[in-house]
Amino acid sequence: MSIILGIDPGSRITGYGVVQQKGSKCIYIASGCIRTKGDTLAPKLDMIFNGISEIIKQYQPTEFGIEQVFMAKNPDSALKLGQARGAAIVAATQADLYVCEYSARQIKQAVSGSGGATKEQVQQMVMQILNLSGRPQADAADGLAVAICHAHTAQTIVAMSGKVSKTVRGRFR
């Protein structure tokens, strides 16, 4: 049984989702957004770091997943996103959590079956997978999607580990 914290980083809004993995099922625990204020970046990064640290203390995750930076049209936006990710990653590593990173395409594929899924499709699938009665806010849904992606990816790696060790020159024994 694992508790997974998924993070969708952003310099203005960082979405998070906490799920418990029981076998092949994901059970909703919590989700929300860390909303930063102000015009300067340093206080925003501090809010992200402190917010993630507080979530870690409250929910005691055993695993941590975060979305990778994608190259936006605006390089300044990509740099700010990278710094927001850094603040979240430091909070995780200070809590002795191993950090796993996933591309937006991997996350969409794991949740919806399509790497090109829209935000609305991801939200809908998150609702179905976690059996939620209402639609989570977009950034929170993305955080939950990261956690679900991590759960599915980790499960696949564990399932394959026994088989991979039984191969010789690419063939199963």
UniProtKB/Swiss-Prot annotation:
Free-text comment on the cofactor: Binds 2 Mg(2+) ion per subunit.
One Gene Ontology cellular component annotation held by this UniProt entry: cytoplasm
InterPro entries found in the cross-reference section: RNaseH-like_sf (IPR012337), RNaseH_sf (IPR036397), X-over_junc_endoDNase_Mg_BS (IPR020563), X-over_junc_endoDNase_RuvC (IPR002176)
UniProt-annotated catalytic positions: D8, E67, D139
Gene Ontology biological process: DNA recombination; DNA repair
CDD domains: RuvC
Catalytic reactions of this protein: Endonucleolytic cleavage at a junction such as a reciprocal single-stranded crossover between two homologous DNA duplexes (Holliday junction)
Annotated GO MF terms: crossover junction DNA endonuclease activity; DNA binding; magnesium ion binding
Main enzyme class: hydrolase
UniProt-annotated binding residues for Mg(2+) 1: D8, D139
Keywords in alphabetical order: Cytoplasm, DNA damage, DNA recombination, DNA repair, DNA-binding, Endonuclease, Hydrolase, Magnesium, Metal-binding, Nuclease
Subcellular location: Cytoplasm
EC number: 3.1.21.10
Cofactor list: Mg(2+)
List of residues binding Mg(2+) 2: E67
HAMAP family from the UniProt entry: RuvC (MF_00034)
Similarity section: Belongs to the RuvC family.
Free-text function comment from the UniProt entry: The RuvA-RuvB-RuvC complex processes Holliday junction (HJ) DNA during genetic recombination and DNA repair. Endonuclease that resolves HJ intermediates. Cleaves cruciform DNA by making single-stranded nicks across the HJ at symmetrical positions within the homologous arms, yielding a 5'-phosphate and a 3'-hydroxyl group; requires a central core of homology in the junction. The consensus cleavage sequence is 5'-(A/T)TT(C/G)-3'. Cleavage occurs on the 3'-side of the TT dinucleotide at the point of strand exchange.
Subunit field text: Homodimer which binds Holliday junction (HJ) DNA. The HJ becomes 2-fold symmetrical on binding to RuvC with unstacked arms; it has a different conformation from HJ DNA in complex with RuvA. In the full resolvosome a probable DNA-RuvA(4)-RuvB(12)-RuvC(2) complex forms which resolves the HJ.
UniProt name for this protein: Crossover junction endodeoxyribonuclease RuvC
Organism listed in the record: Psychromonas ingrahamii (strain DSM 17664 / CCUG 51855 / 37)
Lineage of source species: Bacteria, Pseudomonadati, Pseudomonadota, Gammaproteobacteria, Alteromonadales
Gene name for this UniProt entry: ruvC
